[in-house]
Amino acid sequence: MAYDKSIAAFEEAYKVIPGGVDSPVRAFSGVEGTPPFIERGEGAYLFDIDGNRYIDYVQSWGPLIFGHTDADIEASVIDSVKKGLSFGAPTTVETELAEEIVLMFESIDKVRFVSSGTEAVMSAIRLARGATGRDNILKFTGCYHGHSDSLLVQAGSGLATFGTPSSPGVPADLTKHTLLGTYNDIESVEKCFADSPEGIACVIIEPIAGNMGLVPADETFLQQLRALCDAHGTLLIFDEVMSGFRASLKGAQGITTVKPDMVTLGKVIGAGMPVGAFGAGAETMAQLSPEGPVYQAGTLSGNPVAMAAGLTSLRKLKANPAIYVELGNKAKKLVEGLKRAADSVNVPMVTDVRGSMFGFFFSDKPVKNFADAMENDQKLFAKFHKGMLDRGIYLACSSFETGFISTAITDEMIDETVKAAYETLKEIKG
């Protein structure tokens, strides 16, 4: 494939945008390449400015569960835009979307909308601190919860790609209140509690980690985490910005028996529009302004266009829950095919699937935490990514990112993807 126009566009962007992109992972630094500049999407496909077509397994990093330009979502957005882009005032569509979310998540009585997943998590952390009167929070190495200061400590996602344990500009006085546990290791959590006599406001976790690759939390680990939080009066937050409505209709909470105290959401609930949300029981949410003393606000929170897109998306999912069986079967078919391709050239690979989310590592052992994920062959992944891209397969440009299946992806497209994997790995191994 030719990428001449994208290369030129990247050079132009670099002159006026830091790194040429508005989110670091998009720069393709993790795979030592140049990002295709996308012109449009249609169904399962992306089209770049050079005229190349790709089967898209990134799905705008998760939101597009129905693929690009879904007719129903597109119609709801157009209808909403005709009424106005933003009002900075309450609308009934906010309430309707909130009602759908509350119905689907037992742990949520009330929900508030914001404009991004980062905002959702930042606000949830503030609410947890306000509700408990404690400063310390606990997160897990490799879990990414957006780029708010308190949580840029040994995060995954782009920070893993760039090998940065935290970010300059984040005060040490702030991060001293962020404690670190090891994912799927309850002893590390017990030690954090033992070392914090002043208490911990909240424990935040991706119940299905998606930013150190796809790494689900063990059920026993989540149960032990729930028990520890209960024993210490600590709020348990599930960050389901990625897994919400992706792992199942009820997110990770449709798979695990463990129920959190608070939940953060994003991605699918906006169907590709900028949105985030956080919710909890009525008593906790009553601490939030204007009812309570914990302040949170946003000019574009509950934007009517985003709400309309999200409402249509969730109602489509709710009307046909069998979609998740279909998506899960396709995800399994894909990773099984990738594994066969790797086996054919004696390349070790481990895979996992949770609903419409999938992941793979070039590794010879199961991945249970960030340290395991870091042992995957990143150089091989970079070569594999380039070969797949050249064959029209658009995968996440980091071995630490999760892939996604949309309803627009067909069995024939998966067969084409697996064929490309065979060709790419055979080419790499010579």
UniProtKB/Swiss-Prot annotation:
Pathway: Porphyrin-containing compound metabolism; protoporphyrin-IX biosynthesis; 5-aminolevulinate from L-glutamyl-tRNA(Glu): step 2/2. The modification N6-(pyridoxal phosphate)lysine is found at residue 267. Its cofactor is pyridoxal 5'-phosphate. Keywords: Cytoplasm, Isomerase, Porphyrin biosynthesis, Pyridoxal phosphate. Its main location: cytoplasm. Disulfide bonds: none annotated. GO terms for cellular component: cytoplasm. InterPro entries: 4pyrrol_synth_GluAld_NH2Trfase (IPR004639), Aminotrans_3 (IPR005814), Aminotrans_3_PPA_site (IPR049704), PyrdxlP-dep_Trfase (IPR015424), PyrdxlP-dep_Trfase_major (IPR015421), PyrdxlP-dep_Trfase_small (IPR015422). It catalyses: (S)-4-amino-5-oxopentanoate = 5-aminolevulinate. GO terms for biological process: protoporphyrinogen IX biosynthetic process. PROSITE patterns: AA_TRANSFER_CLASS_3. Its EC number is 5.4.3.8. It is found in: Cytoplasm. It comes from the Bacteria. GO terms for molecular function: glutamate-1-semialdehyde 2,1-aminomutase activity; pyridoxal phosphate binding; transaminase activity. Homodimer. Belongs to the class-III pyridoxal-phosphate-dependent aminotransferase family. HemL subfamily. This is Glutamate-1-semialdehyde 2,1-aminomutase. It comes from Sulfurovum sp. (strain NBC37-1).
